[in-house]
Amino acid sequence: VIKKTQFENLDIITSNVDLSGLEVETADDSNRAFILKTKLTAYLNDSRRLYDYVLIDCPPSLSLLTVMALVSSNSLLVPLQTEFFALEGLTQLMKTIERIKVSLNPDLKIRGILLTMYDKRNKLSSQVEKEARDYFSEKVYSTVIPRNVRLSEAPSHGMPVLIYDKTCPGSKSYFSFTDEFMNQESTIGSAA
């Protein structure tokens, strides 16, 4: 299931069509929210499998797979599009996180919020950024990912943007974000 990539120390597990029936297949399982956590924990406890980070990319909808990912995680990195309905969606996500913390995963926390699809020519992007920074303050990363045509094109070519065009503004922003994230991680690690 795990696939090596062209990047050293980066493995991936891709989604597949079999996951679409998961909700129906597990309908009678009272512990279904813990299926991913159980499997992931068992896999990671094998000493031959050492990973610094496990990232789970979730769809914006609140499906069983998303709940499983939230139950399996210790922290969240929330991408927030700087668009009209994004803050409303974030409010819903916050309510969901609180419910999951109460009943399924008390250790879940938001690591940070990454503003994406930012268009400096658009007043709405600036307004969403301001509201996010006012409300979530230090949780919002300094780096902002701009709206960029190369970011949109890369998936249609079956490539991450960092391979498709590592010099485009979107790629440069993701590199900056990675630096910011890792610097934050080293600060958290040294404070522990």
Question: What spans do the regions from the language model cover?
Answer:
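Charged catalytic carboxylate motif
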Residues: 35, 92, 173
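C-terminal boundary of histidine-terminating zinc-finger modules
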Residues: 155-176
